[in-house]
């Protein structure tokens, strides 16, 4: 049995800059000089199938997007993600809505021809570890916002807060947070006899 040499999403060193998230003035300044990853219905923008497609905050592809979410500092570069799922691609380029994997690619008219929205499962191994981490984080947090638009306490519409890492209810004051706890999957192996222990619980 060969042990993995690298662990996906493990130890990339991305500075999440949690202390800056609640400062709206600082976030505005970071966004102005930052880069944004557009995400369409869970698919990140990708260049030539091998790299994430970062754009400037004022790019036309973001015109109909929701509020950006701060992902963190990648060195000195502030990274954000923005949900543009309300954009409708031209006829014939729709996503495959059923099944485990969507092989379709959507191209926005405001982007170069080698830029497209692709299913993360299909490109994960082509991305750098940092790119894979940022894409997975963007997909997860934006999906959380789309599926948690209403307060679980009173049912009123909630609002994005703290640079995208909280939803606040203006009606009852409740605060809601995404799940960010780590998950570990283990496999018990008997190397000498080439066996694994299966169980459920």
What are these regions (language model features)?
Residues 137:
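Phosphate-interacting basic helix/loop segments used at nucleotide- and nucleic-acid interfaces
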Residues 167-201:
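N-terminal strand-loop-strand
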Residues 145-148, 155, 166:
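Residues immediately within or flanking Cys/His clusters that coordinate Zn2+
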Residues 160-166:
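Short linker/helix segments within small regulatory modules
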Residues 51-54, 132, 167-171:
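Short Pro/Gly-enriched beta-strand edge/turn motifs at strand-loop
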Residues 156-159, 177:
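Short functional micro-motifs and their immediate structural scaffolds
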Residues 1-127:
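N-terminal alpha-helical interaction blocks
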């Amino acid at each position: 049995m060969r042990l993995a040499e690298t662990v996906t999403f493990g130890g990339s060193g991305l500075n999440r800059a949690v202390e800056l998230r609640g400062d709206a003035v600082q976030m505005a300044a970071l966004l102005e000089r930052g880069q944004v990853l557009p995400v369409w219905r869970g698919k990140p923008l990708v260049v030539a199938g091998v790299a994430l497609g970062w754009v400037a905050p004022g790019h036309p592809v973001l015109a109909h997007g929701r509020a950006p979410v701060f992902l963190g500092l990648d060195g000195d570069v502030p990274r954000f993600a923005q949900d543009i799922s309300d954009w409708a691609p031209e006829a014939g380029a729709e996503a495959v809505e059923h099944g485990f994997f969507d092989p379709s690619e959507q191209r926005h008219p405001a982007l170069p021809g080698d830029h497209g929205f692709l299913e993360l499962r299909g490109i994960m191994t082509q991305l750098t570890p940092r790119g894979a981490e940022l894409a997975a984080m963007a997909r997860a947090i934006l999906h959380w916002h789309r599926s948690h638009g209403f307060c679980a306490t009173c049912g009123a519409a909630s609002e994005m807060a703290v640079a995208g890492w909280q939803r606040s209810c203006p009606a009852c004051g409740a605060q809601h947070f995404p799940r960010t706890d780590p998950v570990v999957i283990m496999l018990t192996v008997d190397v000498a006899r080439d066996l694994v222990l299966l169980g459920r619980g």
